[in-house]
């Protein structure tokens, strides 16, 4: 739109500067009016010159066609502004068109005399140029004949024989009076956007307008008809050979300076984002019927036409969907109707409930490239339509359609989608915006909507009323090709898939008054018109991919065509995929491709809000199973996308279930498909028949998630189709398909019952690398918070899915690696949950129970065993309903082993020294006892824990296990446990029944949450039990607090062994507690029978009470030995702990964040901290227990009545949740304040949007936002700041997603070694922590390999619900929960450790929190 070189350089090649350099497509007035008019409220039709249609005609004439076209292209004339305030549509009068680039008419918009011009030539002036007047002998060439007087200055020029003007002052040659006038006016008043030059330029002292009007009158008189441009044109054409002006397309860098006069009709080359190493800021999909209507409209006349694009904008997926086109039926003959036409369009858009998302116009006979004027006008529209805020931002695009460009090798129109990148903020007055070629996908409609038919009919009726305005479709277009045949070739690819092509085509022929076809013969090949040989070549390419259609239409019968095309497409797709992958890799190295998370967090055109709005819970489509996806770079959907799906639904429309794997159109699918790629991504400008580019991954500016970056981080939550990788907590809560991060099959997950989905989700989450998880879970979200949140809203959506997620996330942090290795995976409660979910399929009792029974202590046994055993366990888990005898034998075996260990000092020392043992100890809190059992030497039989051994059927295994465990634990205090078990068994049975009703998947899912809970409880109970029975445990727990890691480890080991024994003995009790937990957990489940009771009582009600009793009894049994504590006391402790946590949270969060950064470290740290440490109080609760288990473990530790502790826990949990909610609410408020959504109009926002910002400014902003949001761990120590920081990433989300906080309990630093896994760079804090004596002797750092996970401290529920951990844990373990480090964004998690590490002493602080 800006001065496009429509005119091109002077034929002579003289240095003619086309003056329309800044043509905004409007005269000064126009542009301004337009801006004002376009108001966001109604879809304001972009101010597009309606007469643009007229311009096309000029183009046809050739002399100024190029220029004219340019003018028309974008310029909205300052035509009558929409009278309706509602119609923000700036009305572009035909004057714009008049101003065809060449045509002085365009300039008519002249500042002062625009109206006069209109009156004079009534729109016909559009075709009048100096050449025209000279040909009619109205003007004669001569020296010094042309003058301009402006603000007291006079400029003189020569009228050359070719109709150009040579300036005396600058010796520059101007193609049109307008160009010269603008140039001269700009010299005097640079800020003035001068309009048409015809009213300013004088010939022999008389304004050119007067000459033009005189000429037009004479023509009209001769015709004895009202001035009719078409007629004038026709007459002139017959008299004068058509002057074909060859348009030259200039690179944008050739017109970099606005201060040099450029022809506004100069064509500027638009380049794809890939050419500049960037990602397209948003995806574009166009409905085939909308494209068909626009293309048809442009074919009706050889003059420029224009229209508006209506559609929708999905912030979540950054997808602009163009669903309807609204032709502007206005020509130079009825300019006065322009405003009315636009208001009608506006009303139609409102009625259709569509947004104005752009405009289209035609370049009838020249290239589909924007003119400078088009560029300016388009940029204007983009600015006007960006909305008041990021939330209201809507992109605006321009389609340029070239129907009759004679150098087009095919018969299909060239359709290009243009979007302007604004110049740098500080150079806006100096530079033109840069036109970028946007890739778009064409979504085939099943049928042609009725309104499209009516629009086609109206367009034909409108243009046919003006003589010589409409193309005669029976005539020959080129060689032997008629206009009708050309139209058929271009429209056919856009025909609806389900409708009869013949019927539709014959209807169009009837409308155009052409011969109808008896047998519809689809254009089988793309006809290539060879201009040189004038022969029509036929390409064999069956698929016609025209830029313009972007549709993948295969000419042969559609079905066959598709199948035929598919093979080729697949091959080409594969190649393209490989190439694109190679390119991507190359670019990654060259450009340092940021991860989606990072990109999302960056301000970019994509995400007009630099602030993360939503943090994906899972990577868009973590199709890759690798546990660790180091960078969340826009994941390419591996296979799913590549399936060639017929162009079906754009990614946007893809059913949510499929979201992860966006269905790509056959073509694109063949290509590398990104989750955000739309079905058919065709390069908008692909002129060649079958040429298509690999779609640019439209990530919001990168990654602004493809899921633009932080993948999906900042998409809006309300998008119709959840963006592939984005999961909102709410989604998770309701297990919406989009949410389920089932890594293996998003689609499947979507279809799976929420519960089932969740389970895999946990697994997937765990499997996913921390990075992946990080991408998925906003680190800001603490699991405790999640849990609290859920508890608060348990009624709304069971905490299960969220808890599961939280737990999974937390655990994943720890178990991701473990997940990788089955053994480690099993250890994690989350993993356990996942396993449980899977084991469900095997009818395996809740692994939770298993985990509980086996509780990390069992891990102490041979870790090597655990692996094989684990695998077997999983299998055995399926057969978890083994006879109780089996479990008993296991117990016996376990006890024997424990005895041996006890009695054999060598073995003991060995065990104590073994890293596995340390890890096992750390993991003792893990829910999955199977792994634990395996490590204990139980073998892989889950049944033992599940209670298969207990003699309980798998379903009842837990219950049974409880009972049998109780029996075995009778030795340790089985009577209460047994009683509880009995009570529980009923509940448990109920739960089981419920689970059956719910279906194992949902049950498992719940169990997952439960797992978190269970793990939490189990940890506490196990710890309590372990620590309580043997004094050494107490000592050990105390020692764990103690600095000497060895002693602690030994104590812990002893503890562990004792615990194991106790567990074995109490396995019953623990089993009971496991059952309890499960039941209890179930209580949490929204679906759970007990849930109601639970929600009603924040304490466990009914079954809960029993459960709590059981649990407490179990705890009491195990940990009852420790001094007794009252519920109140525990509560107080808990609250204290909570407060401490909250206060310390900052550090904690920082540490955790750091840990999180090191993907694996988080879990390990948590586990570390959670390592069973003898409570200082003497209660042995793992550090984890301290936090999470603090209530349960504490109760055990403090010797509180276990029942009370349990029920307390529930109550505490709920209360905590509530508190947390409060905090969160406040936090969110804070967040908003701190990281509010930027004002869209603010420079920073614009910069973020890549609009109007200097690169440096943009860069700075990006850096700031990145550092604030992503890279740097919060520096402030205050919890609020920590929270704020984490919140910065995404205000609401952050809290919604569980954060993997490495809230490891007190001093357990032993696990830290594992944290320092070789793979990851650990932050100073991590190192500091690892350096601290650990509770466990684990000498071997986990390398981050999943295998090492078994050594890794199990993520402790405390970590998961660290905030929930009753303060008692603090007291009990003598450790204070570490502060949780919260990251502003997922990116933080995945990001390399911050340059500045928190002081090492921070780690110490954390470790020593217990002493605070």
Swiss-Prot record:
Protein EC: 3.4.-.-
Domain of life according to the entry: Eukaryota
Biased composition range(s): Low complexity: 873-891, 1036-1066, 1360-1370
Domain RAMA per the UniProt entry, residue ranges: 113-219
Post-translational modification Phosphothreonine, affected residues: 1297
Gene Ontology biological process terms in this record: proteolysis
UniProt cross-references to InterPro entries, sorted A to Z: JAMM/MPN+_dom, JAMM_MPN+_peptidase_M67A, MPN, RAMA
Cysteine disulfide partners in this protein: none
Alphabetically ordered keywords of this record: Coiled coil, Hydrolase, Metal-binding, Metalloprotease, Phosphoprotein, Protease, Zinc
Binding site for Zn(2+): 361, 363, 374
A molecular function GO annotation: metal-dependent deubiquitinase activity
Record domain MPN: where: 284-420
Record keyword Transferase present: no
Residue spans of biased composition, Acidic residues class: 23-35, 103-114
Chain segments carrying region Disordered: 1-123, 554-589, 669-734, 853-891, 1027-1066, 1271-1318, 1330-1376, 1389-1412
Coiled coil: 572-600
Keyword check for Kinase: no
GO CC term, one of those recorded: nucleoplasm
Top EC class of this enzyme: hydrolase
Chain intervals with Basic and acidic residues compositional bias: 1-10
Alphabetized PANTHER family for the sequence: EUKARYOTIC TRANSLATION INITIATION FACTOR 3 -RELATED
Domain notes: The JAMM motif may mediate the protease activity.
Function: Probable protease.
Entry's family note: Belongs to the peptidase M67 family.
Name of this protein: MPN domain-containing protein CG4751
